[in-house]
């Protein structure tokens, strides 16, 4: 479904993100009492009166000021208006009409986009009508008093909004693959997003922390629809102060949790840091498919063996993700960027894959023939009766054995490796659940499922 888009526009700190959260009935937009919290444009879906649409939140718009990030924020606002079906100009009722409001209103009047004025911070209905009346001078029609914090007036505002929107262009509601771009600050995540999209979708700067929110971007590659999430850079907890970065990092962790596949971006120049290792552990812990993207490869002096040496060194430190594909790219030049989708799609497919019990047991039987389960000093030997896949996302296998304690970590890793070697599963973690059960307790189950035991007591 292609949804009509509403662009939320206004000066810094007039309550745009709070209003977005109110209209979308969510807390996805970061709200903090400080100008410049929202920089890139961020999207959320909403519905009202049986009509669905998406709202794009933008940074505070300031003309004639070239201070840090303001030119880039302007570019993001301009792009948001280009794709919008409707603009919602948010102003501060308590402050009244400012020169900034007049400049934005003039720009909107010269655009071809229909605009509705929302006068925010009108907590009292009676007083709100009085405060809103001043904004007739913007020349954009009737101003509408609302309170983003308390919700008053937002229902009437939404009634106006859906009345101005075009009918939804309904297409096949195709599944979207959720891909999050994860990494430390300044490893090139936003540059990678821009390279993938072929436009300046996110603000890029050498200053750490430019991205403070998680940015969702829809893109179609081949037959697949992707939702790409660019996340805030994640630093050590002790270096993170309460505020926008704190909220952004929480959003980034949530992005991992809701992803089908994570793209962990590593800086080729800096190599793997402690924080990279923690992020790798988080991805593995959440059971997400993953590919490792080594960015800034264009900055490395190379010979014929460099890539192999670097990969070996990186993998030795990213042992949590030993199963992930590693590719070397340059977001700046676009080198190998398109390969990301191929490997990410393969990782997603492997993450969702199911294997029949008969195939699983063929692999286990062959694995045992090459290397028998260990025998304890007491003379008791491990017996592996059979295995079956019990779920996917990530692929999870239950292995029924006589006593899990007889199977040490070395042999468990061997079995996992054999499953990967014989069945694939590149790009996804595997979970092996070792369950102790007496053979006689399994007899009815294996007879019912027509399973042949690999080993018997």
UniProtKB/Swiss-Prot annotation:
Entry keyword annotation includes Iron: no
Keywords linked to the UniProt accession: GTP-binding, Nucleotide-binding, Repeat, Ribosome biogenesis
Residue ranges occupied by any KH-like domain in the UniProt entry: 353-438
CDD domains recorded: EngA1 (cd01894), EngA2 (cd01895)
GO BP: any one term: ribosome biogenesis
Residues bound to GTP 2: 183-190, 230-234, 295-298
Annotated GO MF terms: GTP binding; ribosome binding
Family according to the record: Belongs to the TRAFAC class TrmE-Era-EngA-EngB-Septin-like GTPase superfamily. EngA (Der) GTPase family.
Function text: GTPase that plays an essential role in the late steps of ribosome biogenesis.
Subunit structure: Associates with the 50S ribosomal subunit.
Annotated protein name in UniProt: GTPase Der
Source organism of this protein record: Prochlorococcus marinus (strain AS9601)
């Amino acid at each position: 479904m292609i949804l009509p888009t509403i662009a939320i526009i206004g000066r810094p700190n007039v309550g745009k993100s709070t209003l977005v959260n109110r209209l979308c009935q969510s807390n996805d937009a970061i709200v903090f009492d400080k100008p410049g919290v929202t920089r890139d444009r961020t999207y959320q879906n909403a519905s009202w009166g049986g009509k669905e649409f998406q709202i794009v939140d933008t940074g505070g718009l300031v003309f004639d000021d070239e201070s840090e990030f303001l030119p880039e924020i302007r570019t993001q606002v301009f792009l948001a208006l280009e794709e919008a079906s409707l603009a919602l100009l948010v102003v501060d009722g308590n402050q009244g009409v400012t020169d900034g409001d007049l400049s934005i209103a003039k720009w909107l009047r010269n655009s071809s986009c229909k605009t509705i004025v929302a006068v925010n911070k009108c907590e009292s209905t009676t007083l709100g009508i009085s405060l809103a009346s001043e904004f007739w001078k913007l020349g954009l029609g009737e101003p509408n008093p609302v309170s983003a914090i308390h919700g008053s007036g937002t229902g009437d505002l939404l009634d106006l909004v859906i009345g101005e929107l075009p009918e939804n262009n309904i297409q096949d509601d195709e599944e979207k693959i959720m891909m999050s771009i994860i990494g430390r600050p300044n490893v090139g995540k936003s540059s990678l997003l821009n390279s993938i999209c072929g436009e300046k979708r996110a603000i890029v700067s050498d200053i750490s922390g430019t991205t403070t929110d998680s940015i969702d971007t829809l893109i179609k590659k081949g037959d697949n629809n992707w939702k790409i999430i660019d996340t805030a850079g994640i630093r050590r907890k002790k270096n993170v102060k309460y505020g926008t970065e704190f909220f952004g990092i929480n959003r980034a962790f949530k992005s991992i949790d809701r992803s089908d596949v994570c793209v962990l971006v590593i800086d080729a120049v800096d190599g793997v840091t402690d924080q990279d290792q923690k992020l790798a552990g988080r991805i593995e812990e959440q059971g997400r498919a993953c590919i490792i993207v080594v960015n800034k490869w264009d900055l490395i002096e190379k010979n014929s063996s460099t890539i192999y040496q670097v990969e070996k060194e990186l993998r030795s430190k990213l042992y949590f993700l030993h199963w992930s594909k590693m590719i070397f790219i340059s977001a700046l030049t676009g080198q190998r960027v398109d390969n990301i989708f191929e490997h990410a799609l393969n990782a997603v497919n492997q993450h969702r894959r199911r294997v029949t019990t008969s195939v699983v047991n063929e692999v286990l039987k062959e694995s045992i023939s090459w290397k028998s389960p260990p025998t304890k000093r007491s003379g008791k030997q491990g017996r592996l009766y059979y295995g079956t896949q019990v779920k996917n996302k990530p692929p999870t296998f239950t292995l029924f054995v006589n006593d899990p304690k007889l199977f040490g970590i070395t042999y468990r890793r061997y079995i996992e490796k054999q499953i990967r070697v014989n069945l694939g599963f590149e790009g996804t973690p595997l979970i092996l659940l070792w369950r102790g059960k007496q053979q006689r307790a399994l007899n009815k189950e294996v007879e019912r499922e027509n399973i042949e035991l690999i080993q018997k007591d």
